[in-house]
Regions:
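Catalytic nucleophile-loop/oxyanion-hole region of alpha/beta-hydrolase
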Residues: 71-83, 130
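Flexible "cap/lid" loop of the alpha/beta hydrolase fold
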Residues: 122-160
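Conserved HGGG/HGGXW glycine-rich cap/lid loop of the alpha/beta-hydrolase fold
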Residues: 6-75, 89
Length: 196
């Protein structure tokens, strides 16, 4: 589904019911909004891990502005705008006091949202994220994990993004984030809609 927010069309998917039909009073389930990593990926990377919680929460998967199926011009890709998108999204759909889960980049958006709108979030769950991005630390990590070539690609990707840099980062650097012995290492790229 799509919703227009701040000159962008945001894609979202809902799993689970808002009202619990198995209770006599049709009690309201908490809504959990799930924010994917990236930028450049979509919510499908989270679905295999979180759909199972639809028996206790209504799950709302959101593709950030400019990511996945969502639109939005690159000049509007910044944390204030992504946080404001989430606030407007919740207000428009009547989602009050959501539990907000943020993975990696989604965690940065979640923290920014909670800082800008502290009275509008009930809980914040953060996974594999940081309060701020440090290019030098990321380049150092890529050098340690993948050598000088991986460090060079990471620097190019984060300092001068292009389709070529995005493709190289996806091929060389992204696998370094995974356990190479895992049976599904790197398979998330097969399901995700990737956009630089």
């Amino acid at each position: 589904m799509f919703i227009d927010v701040g000159a962008a069309s945001l894609f979202f998917d809902v799993v689970g019911e808002s009202l619990n039909a198995s209770t006599p009073d049709m009690s309201q389930r908490p809504t959990m909004i799930l924010l994917h990593g990236g930028p450049g990926y979509d919510h499908s990377t989270l679905r295999p891990y979180f759909d199972r919680y639809s028996d206790t929460h209504q799950l709302v998967y959101l593709d950030h502005r400019g990511c996945g199926r969502s639109t939005g011009e690159q000049k509007t890709w910044y944390l204030d705008r992504w946080a404001d998108d989430l606030a407007e999204f919740c207000r428009t759909l009547g989602i009050n006091f959501p539990v907000v889960f943020g993975q990696s980049f989604g965690g940065m958006v979640a923290m920014h949202y909670a800082a800008r709108y502290p009275s509008e979030v009930s809980k914040l769950i953060l996974s594999s994220t940081a309060a701020q991005f440090r290019l030098d630390d990321t380049v150092k990590m890529m050098r340690e994990l993948g050598g000088d070539y991986a460090a060079e690609i990471a620097h190019q990707f984060f300092s001068n993004p292009s389709q070529e840099a995005y493709d190289a980062y996806g091929e060389i650097c992204l696998p370094l984030y995974s356990n190479p012995n895992a049976s599904d290492a790197g398979n998330f790229r097969n399901r995700a809609i990737e956009r630089p």
